[in-house]
Curated annotation (Swiss-Prot):
Name of the protein: ATPase synthesis protein 25, mitochondrial
Keywords on record: Membrane, Mitochondrion, Mitochondrion inner membrane, Transit peptide
Compositionally biased tracts (Basic residues): 194-203
A cellular component annotation (GO) from this entry: mitochondrial inner membrane
First and last residues of the transit peptide: 1-40
Record's keyword annotation contains Protease: no
Swiss-Prot/TrEMBL GO biological process terms: mitochondrial gene expression; mitochondrial proton-transporting ATP synthase complex assembly; mRNA stabilization
Family: Belongs to the ATP25 family.
Membrane topology, record value: Peripheral membrane protein
Subcellular location: Mitochondrion inner membrane
InterPro entries xref list: Atp25 (IPR040152), ATP25_mRNA_stabil_dom (IPR025210), NT_sf (IPR043519)
Chain residue ranges for the region called Disordered: 187-218
Length: 628
C-alpha cells in the first residue's frame, strides 16, 4: 500500500512539472496545494513525507521566473569577478614611480610593464641626459655616456630576473619592433655546465659545491638590459645583489648621492649566520671576512691612485707576459671604476716615469698595445681634447724613452695622422707640440747633421699638409717653433728658413699690414742664431721703409740685445759705420731704460774691440727729445 502511494506521488509530480502554466505565481500555488493534499494522505510514513519535501524543493529551484529569491551564480563566474577585484587592488599598483621631465612614451610603457605585469619592486629612474656641467663629467661610469635613462628594479630571485627579461623582450618586439640585449647571469643550462667543470677540479671544491651549490636560482643576480630604444637601460637585480652593488650611488645626481651611501646597519653575527650555512672548511674564513667587512663607497677617486701602480705593471712588460699585464690593467680599471680618459692618463703618467728612470728594456709593441687597448672606438666630441692630449703625452714619453725603437715618424703617424683620419681637426697646438719635439731632438743629439735636418723637414712638410687654414702663419708661436726645426747651429741649418722669412715679408707687403712686434723678434732671433748678418740687415732695412718720424715700430732694444749676444767686432763696426743707430735720433725713438742699457752695453763692447764710438754715443744718449 505504501509503495502504491509513493509511485502515484511521483507520477503526479512529473505531470505537474511537465504541464505547469507560464505564470510563475499560479504554478507556485498549484504546487503548494498538491503537496498539502499528499501530506494528508499519509501521516504515518516519514519516508513519503521526506520524499515529497525534497521534490517540492526541486520544483522551486526549477522555477526561473520566481520573485521570492534569485538563483545562486556558479563558482567559476565568481572567480572572474574576484580576479578583477585583485587586479584593481593589487599592491603593485601602489608603487609610485617618479618619471623624469619630458620622458618618452617608451619609458612609461616599460615601467608600467615592470610594475604591473612582471611584479618588480623598488623601481627608480635616473635621468642621465645632462652628462656635463661646466665641462665636468657628472657620472663616473662608461654606461652613463651612452644612456639617457637608467632604470633600477628589484626581483624576487634569479628565475624572476630571467623571466622578466624574456617577457620584456617580447613586449619590445611586439610594441616597439626592437630587440633588447642582456648582460649578466647566464641561463640555467650554461650554469649547470659551469658547475660540472668546477666540480671536476678538486675534492674540496666538489664538496663545497655539493653543500652550497650556486645554480641559477641563487639570490645574488644582476641583469642589465639594453632596450635599444631611446637609450633606455634596465637593471633587474635581486635584493641582496642590489644592496651589495649600490648602483644608485653611481647614477644619482651629485647633490643626491649622499642619501644612497651604504649603511652597514646589520650586525656581523647576523651576516655570518646568513652566509655560513655550509659546514665546510671555508666557513671560518668567510665569517672572518664578513666581520672585517666595511662599508665602502662605490665611487672611486682616480686622483688618489698613484702612477706607481701602472708603473709596476709596465715595468716588467715583455712579449711572454703581455696578456697577463693586459688582464691586470683591466682588473685595475674595473676595481677602481676608472673611465677611459682616467686610464689613458694613468698610462701616460706611467710611461713618463719609465722615461725619467731610463727604463730602456721595455717591450714597445706591448706598451703600445696596452695603450691602444684602452683607446675608445668612438671618441666623444665633448672632451676629445683630453683624449688626444693623453695620446700625445704617452707617445712623447715613448719617443723620449728610446728614439731608436720609437721614432718621430711613429709619433707623427700615431698622433697627428690618426687624429686627422679619425675625423678630428689638427690644430695649431698639435703642430706646435710636434715641432717642439722635433727641435729638441735635433739639439739634444750631438751627432745631428744636415741630413737629420732633411728628414726633419720632410716630417714638417707632412705635418703642414694636414692644415688647411693659412691663417696659421699669423701665429707667432707657431712660426717660432717652425723656424726652430730648421736650425741646429750657425753652420747647420736649412735654406727653408730664408724662404719662410721672405714669404712672411711678402705676405705683409701684399696685405698692407705690418708685421707684429713678436713676429719681428722671432725672425731676428732666428737670423742671429744662424749669424746671417746680411739677411738680418736686409730684413731690418725693409722694416725701416715703413718707419717714419715718431713712428718707428721696430724693436730696437731686442735688436741690440741679440747683436750684443751673437755679434762680433765685424758686426759692431758695420753697424757703426752704416749709421744704423742714428735712426734712433732721426725717428725720435723713445729712450726707454731697456734701450738705454742695451746701447750702453753695445758701446762698451765696441770700445773693447777698439772701435771709436764716442761721437755716436754722445749724439744718441745725450740727445734731447723733440717737442711734441
Amino acid at each position: 500500500m505504501l509503495r502504491l502511494k509513493f509511485n502515484s506521488t511521483r507520477r503526479l509530480t512529473a505531470l505537474a512539472t511537465k504541464h505547469k502554466p507560464s505564470s510563475g505565481i499560479y504554478s507556485f500555488h498549484l504546487q503548494n496545494k498538491f503537496i498539502q493534499s499528499q501530506r494528508f494522505q499519509s501521516t504515518t510514513n516519514d519516508f513519503n513525507t521526506n520524499a515529497i519535501n525534497s521534490d517540492s524543493k526541486n520544483l522551486e529551484e526549477l522555477d526561473v521566473n520566481k520573485t521570492v529569491s534569485s538563483a545562486p551564480q556558479p563558482w567559476y563566474l565568481t572567480m572572474v569577478k574576484r580576479e578583477k577585484l585583485v587586479e584593481n587592488n593589487t599592491i603593485l599598483e601602489d608603487q609610485v614611480v617618479k618619471y623624469p621631465e619630458n620622458s618618452p612614451g617608451s619609458l612609461i610603457s616599460i615601467i608600467e610593464m615592470l610594475k604591473t605585469e612582471l611584479g618588480l619592486t623598488d623601481i627608480l629612474i635616473f635621468d642621465l641626459r645632462e652628462k656635463e656641467t661646466n665641462n665636468e663629467y657628472n657620472y663616473p661610469t662608461a654606461a652613463a655616456k651612452i644612456s639617457d635613462f637608467m632604470v633600477l628594479s628589484t626581483a624576487q630571485s634569479t628565475k624572476h630576473c630571467e623571466k622578466c627579461f624574456v617577457e620584456l623582450n617580447k613586449m619590445m618586439k611586439q610594441k616597439f619592433n626592437s630587440i633588447a640585449s642582456v648582460e649578466g647571469n647566464i641561463n640555467s643550462n650554461d650554469e649547470r655546465k659551469k658547475q660540472k667543470r668546477l666540480a671536476r677540479k678538486r675534492n674540496l671544491e666538489r664538496s663545497s659545491l655539493a653543500k652550497n651549490p650556486t645554480t641559477s636560482t641563487s639570490r645574488d643576480s644582476w641583469y642589465l638590459v639594453d632596450c635599444h630604444l631611446d637609450n633606455i637601460f634596465v637593471n633587474i637585480l635581486t635584493k641582496n645583489r642590489r644592496k651589495e652593488l649600490n648602483l644608485e650611488e653611481l647614477y644619482a645626481p651629485k647633490e643626491e648621492r649622499e642619501k644612497y651611501r651604504y649603511d652597514n646597519s646589520r650586525s656581523d653575527l647576523e651576516l655570518s649566520d646568513e652566509y655560513s650555512s655550509g659546514n665546510n672548511i671555508l666557513s671560518g674564513l668567510r665569517k672572518i671576512a664578513l666581520q672585517r667587512r666595511r662599508a665602502y663607497s662605490t665611487l672611486a677617486n682616480p686622483s688618489q691612485l698613484s702612477p706607481d701602480i701602472a708603473f709596476d705593471i709596465l715595468k716588467g712588460l715583455n712579449k711572454d707576459n703581455l696578456h697577463i699585464k693586459l688582464k691586470e690593467l683591466d682588473q685595475l680599471k674595473s676595481a677602481s671604476s676608472l673611465t677611459d680618459i682616467d686610464t689613458l692618463n694613468f698610462l701616460s703618467s706611467a710611461a713618463k716615469q719609465l722615461s725619467n728612470k731610463q727604463e730602456k728594456k721595455v717591450y714597445f709593441k706591448g706598451l703600445q698595445k696596452m695603450f691602444e687597448s684602452q683607446w675608445p672606438l668612438i671618441i666623444p666630441r665633448t672632451n676629445s681634447d683630453e683624449f688626444w692630449s693623453a695620446r700625445s703625452n704617452f707617445y712623447k714619453s715613448c719617443f723620449e724613452l728610446n728614439p731608436q725603437q720609437f721614432s718621430l715618424k711613429d709619433y707623427f703617424i700615431n698622433c697627428l695622422l690618426i687624429k686627422r683620419v679619425s675625423g678630428f681637426k689638427v690644430e695649431e697646438k698639435d703642430l706646435i707640440n710636434f715641432f717642439n719635439i722635433l727641435s729638441s731632438s735635433l739639439l739634444s743629439n750631438e751627432k745631428s747633421n744636415y741630413w737629420n735636418l732633411i728628414k726633419s723637414n720632410n716630417l714638417v712638410v707632412s705635418a703642414l699638409n694636414l692644415i688647411d687654414d693659412e691663417r696659421i702663419i699669423k701665429n707667432s708661436q707657431f712660426i717660432d717653433t717652425l723656424l726652430n726645426t730648421m736650425i741646429i747651429d750657425e753652420n747647420k741649418h736649412s735654406r727653408a728658413l730664408y724662404e719662410i722669412v721672405d714669404y712672411l715679408v711678402y705676405n705683409s707687403e701684399r696685405s698692407n699690414k705690418a708685421l707684429e712686434i713678436p713676429m719681428i723678434t722671432i725672425i731676428i732671433n732666428a737670423l742671429c742664431r744662424v749669424q746671417n748678418w746680411s739677411k738680418l740687415w736686409q730684413f731690418w732695412d725693409i722694416l725701416g721703409k715703413n718707419a717714419n718720424y715718431r713712428n718707428d715700430f721696430r724693436p730696437w732694444a731686442e735688436y741690440l740685445r741679440l747683436i750684443n749676444k751673437n755679434g762680433n767686432e765685424t758686426v759692431h763696426r758695420k753697424i757703426i759705420e752704416d749709421g744704423q743707430l742714428l735712426w734712433i735720433v732721426r725717428n725720435d725713438v723713445p729712450l726707454t731704460k731697456e734701450l738705454t742699457d742695451q746701447l750702453s752695453k753695445f758701446f762698451s763692447l765696441s770700445n773693447d774691440e777698439g772701435i771709436e764710438t764716442d761721437t755716436v754715443k754722445e749724439l744718441i744718449l745725450n740727445a734731447k727729445p723733440s717737442p711734441v
